[in-house]
Amino acid sequence: MKKLFASLITALVMISGAHAAGASVTLDKFPKERLTNVAALQNGAKLFVNYCLNCHSAAFMRYNRLKDIGLTDEQIKQNLLFATEKVGETMVVSLNPKDAKEWFGATPPDLTLVARSRASHSGTGADYLYTCMRTFYRDDTRPTGWNNLVFPNVG
């Protein structure tokens, strides 16, 4: 019983610490009508593959799941696969984690489950991502020249 109580107290302390360390920015509400806007979803997939997937993997997502937003296997092959990837493979990067750490100071995280992991009392995971993507700003003090209000010192 004492171990259970100690574990509970430890968990509560950790949760409150994690809560305190969370974003102090008020999250914008993600416009829910965008979830049914197929063209916007397909454009987002293209932007993710062209820009984010160069450093960030989405290792728990397969390219063929993009059929869920109306893309065909042929469209995926023609527009989203650039090397030897196959439609049924997971979205991984060829970036060596050791090189990434050296170049960026940290290995870019896998983005597959960010929406689920960032849901909180402040908003949904979609709200977090929406706000995060909208709050980048120029910051000449950062190595990349950019910073973010939701995720300070990212990149």
Residues covered by each model-derived region:
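Post-cleavage N-terminal segment of exported redox proteins
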Residues: 1-35
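Electrostatic cytochrome c docking/interface patches
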Residues: 21-46, 57-68, 76
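Short, well-structured alpha-helical interface segments that form or flank functional binding sites
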Residues: 39, 43, 106, 124, ...
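Short loop/turn segments at secondary-structure transitions that flank enzyme active sites
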Residues: 61, 117, 135
